[in-house]
């Protein structure tokens, strides 16, 4: 068992078995797996697949681009970017179990030639400078306290002119009180939200010039209300396989938005050469 509290939060221990059992219960053959079968479980961020599509369109992804997915989870977004946009995707995640399961699911859908995963720390990325055309991250920074290192590392591995595509939950200005648990943290000890102004300053400090800044908090509130109303008896495949007690956590997200404690932002920033 890991001693890192963030990795521990996302470690189940039997995740692959749970996902495969869920696939069977939902009527799918895990040995002949189609990509669409994983939809209910492979994207655990606001809006699910729709959030991935919106960020990809904002980033203007092009065929042949090499994308680094920081905090790649079960690999759903990475597989989607490779399948729909013709990108090669490298995923990196702190949680060893997520990396292993993402790689196995990717093998089962036949995309392991263009989508790969490895374990790594977002504040100390195991990649060379200027390697990627796009750095992609969704709902990851909320667990990372060392934000200057995070943004510096994402900029370091981006080629000049490359883009950072991020989709994150932020603290409202002034950091109002947030109620726990939430999907990324059981309590405040592993939650590290930045405000919009703090995030913009971090981007600028890393040489990342904002090109798109979309506040989608109002739309997110509706999604969080949906999470709060999930059935007590969940379907075979769903976010409950990764994040227990999702109804309570979804309700706290909605409460955070309603009370003005949270904001949700889609951002694209360009890696500019310092003058």
State the predicted function of each range.
Residues 212-275:
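Conserved Class I S-adenosyl-L-methionine
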Residues 66-70, 74-124:
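Class I SAM-dependent methyltransferase SAM/SAH-binding core
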Residues 191-207:
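Short alpha-helix
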Residues 148-163:
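A short glycine-rich, Lys/Arg-flanked "PGG" loop and its adjoining helix->strand segment in the class I
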Residues 169-190:
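Short, glycine-/aromatic-enriched active-site segment of Class I SAM-dependent methyltransferases
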Residues 45-63:
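Conserved alpha-helix/loop element of class I SAM-dependent methyltransferases that forms part
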Residues 123-134:
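A short acidic, Gly/Pro-enriched loop at the edge of an enzyme's catalytic core
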Residues 1-25:
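N-terminal auxiliary segments of SAM/dcSAM-dependent transferases
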């Amino acid at each position: 068992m890991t001693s890192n509290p963030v990795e521990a939060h996302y470690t189940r221990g039997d995740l692959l078995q749970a996902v495969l059992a869920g696939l069977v219960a939902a009527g799918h053959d895990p040995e002949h797996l189609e990509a669409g079968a994983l939809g209910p479980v492979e994207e655990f961020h606001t809006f699910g697949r729709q959030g991935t599509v919106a960020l990809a369109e904002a980033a203007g992804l092009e065929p042949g681009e090499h994308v680094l997915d920081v905090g790649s989870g079960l690999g759903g977004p990475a597989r989607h970017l490779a399948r729909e946009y013709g990108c090669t995707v490298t995923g990196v995640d702190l949680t060893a179990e997520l990396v292993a399961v993402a790689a196995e699911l990717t093998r089962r859908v036949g995309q392991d030639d263009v989508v790969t995963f490895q374990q790594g720390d977002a504040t100390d990325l195991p990649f060379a400078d200027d390697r990627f055309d796009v750095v992609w991250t969704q709902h990851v920074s909320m667990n990372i306290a060392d934000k200057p290192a995070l943004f510096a590392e994402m900029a370091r591995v981006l080629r000049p002119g490359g883009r950072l595509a991020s989709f994150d939950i932020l603290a409202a200005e002034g950091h109002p009180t947030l109620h726990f648990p939430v999907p990324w943290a059981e309590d405040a000890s592993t939650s590290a939200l930045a405000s919009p102004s703090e995030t913009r300053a971090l981007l600028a400090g890393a040489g990342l010039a904002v090109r798109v800044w979309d506040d989608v908090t109002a739309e997110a509130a509706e999604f969080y209300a949906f999470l709060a109303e999930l059935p007590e008896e969940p379907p075979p495949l769903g976010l409950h396989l990764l994040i227990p007690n999702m109804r309570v956590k979804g309700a706290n997200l909605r409460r955070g938005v309603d009370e003005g404690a949270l904001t949700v932002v889609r951002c694209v920033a360009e890696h500019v050469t310092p003058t």
